[in-house]
A protein has these predicted regions:
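P-loop NTP-binding catalytic core
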Residues: 1-76
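Walker A (P-loop) phosphate-binding loop of P-loop NTPases
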Residues: 87
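Conserved lysine of the Walker
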Residues: 90
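Helical/strand "switch-coupling" subdomains that flank nucleotide/phosphate-binding cores, especially
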Residues: 209-237
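NTP-binding/hydrolysis catalytic cores, primarily Walker-type P-loop NTPases
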Residues: 230-377
Length: 377
């Protein structure tokens, strides 16, 4: 019935079928291929923003400061590509980011299967939904899209050479993009895009272009959570891409959560800060580490409350907090308490960058504080 309604064939000669309805995506594999019977996958794509700030913060989908940082980057017109496996929630996340674009900024969505539904979610906004097909390719739609003069172009998924070129041409022409891609980690996004190309383009030139115009990569991971007793999704990586002053393509991991619960946080580079300033968005260079840092004594060192772990060595906090900072990371273990200051997020082995100058009473050594009491001053 799905095949008939779409005017397609589903038989031994055409054993694969992709179908869609208003809020469903369906994939069928004929029993000539799937030997235990027709294989069916149905995914719901409702016309609503399913992610809500309070809920995703409370359920450890994303850290509060990472959340606020990303929305600040959307405000500053950063190009963002979200990576992850099938079903990890990439599309829902770019819908959430798109919901925080400015109301007067025109959005055009380009999809081969409609699942963003932003035109229905925000009927009062100037949003145009375009769908590719056998007649209108990504390239054809993009040419028309450019003539519509959008501020934002949303490509639901980069999974072909044509889609890669659509992204590159969009960002190179000054438009802003939000898109998704299948990749194993955020830092692999540029190389994954290159691997989808069918032509022998110069790899260094291509990667430099992506690093120059795509500011951020975000990776979303999905897994069964013992804590929540259900399938759980979370933002596990945020990576900044940039090109150095001597024209080298580089990346910087701003946030990473490993499977064993370790988390690292780093501040954005001067390149991202400068780009945001050019867009009229002022962001403190210590926006991430400053708001997130907490110091808690490790279990495996002395009980005098003066020692804590920096990388793989022990750093002694001399003179009760007055001294010099060694670069490195501070490790916070689950439920540890120092001077009655607990691990407020109840996470295991949280790792934070330590190079944070002058934010606690003008001293260079961070002291135990409640994260909720830290401000931007």
């Amino acid at each position: 019935q799905c095949a008939n309604s779409m005017g397609k064939s589903f038989n031994m000669a055409n054993p694969f079928l992709d179908a869609e309805s208003a809020e469903l995506r369906m994939n069928f594999v004929h029993d000539s291929i799937a030997k235990n019977g027709i294989a069916v996958l149905i995914r719901k794509t409702p016309a609503k923003i399913r992610l809500q700030k309070d809920k995703i913060i409370a359920e450890d989908y994303i850290r509060l400061n990472i959340h606020d940082f990303l929305l600040k980057c959307v405000e500053g017109h950063c190009n963002i590509i979200v990576s992850g496996e099938t079903g990890s929630g990439k599309t829902e996340f770019i819908k959430y980011l798109a919901a925080h674009t400015k109301e007067n900024e025109k959005i055009i969505t380009i999809e081969d299967t409609l699942e963003l539904h932003l035109d229905k979610i925000f009927p009062h906004r100037d949003i145009v939904a375009m769908k590719t097909n056998n007649i209108a390719s990504y390239s054809d739609v993009l040419v028309t899209c450019m003539r519509q003069n959008p501020r934002w172009i949303l490509l639901s998924e980069v999974r072909s050479a044509e889609a890669v070129m659509a992204v590159r041409n969009s960002i190179s022409s000054g438009h802003n993009i939000l898109s998704t891609i299948h990749a194993d980690k955020a830092e692999s996004i540029p190389s994954r895009m290159y691997s989808l190309l069918e032509t022998n383009q110069d790899v260094e030139q291509f990667l430099t272009t992506i690093h120059r115009y795509v500011q951020l990569g975000v990776h979303i991971k999905g897994y069964y959570s013992q804590k929540y007793k259900r399938f759980h999704r979370e933002v596990s990586e945020v990576v900044e891409f940039y090109v150095t002053d001597d024209n080298k393509a580089e990346y910087k991991i701003l946030y990473k959560k490993t499977p064993d619960g370790h988390e690292t946080v780093a501040n954005p580079s001067k390149y991202l800060i400068g780009y945001l300033e050019s867009q009229g968005v002022i962001m403190p260079q210590d926006i991430l580490v400053k708001e997130e840092f907490r110091e808690v004594k490790s279990d495996n060192i002395s009980n005098d409350n003066n020692d804590f772990i920096v990388d793989n060595s022990t750093y002694r906090n001399m003179n009760n907090g007055v001294g010099t900072i060694n670069s490195g990371n501070v490790v916070q273990s689950n439920k540890q308490v120092l001077n009655n200051i607990p691990n407020y997020n109840n996470q295991s082995n949280i790792v934070y960058s330590q190079n944070i100058p002058n934010i606690y009473g003008g001293q260079n050594i961070p002291r135990p504080v409640n994260i909720n009491n830290i401000n931007n001053s």
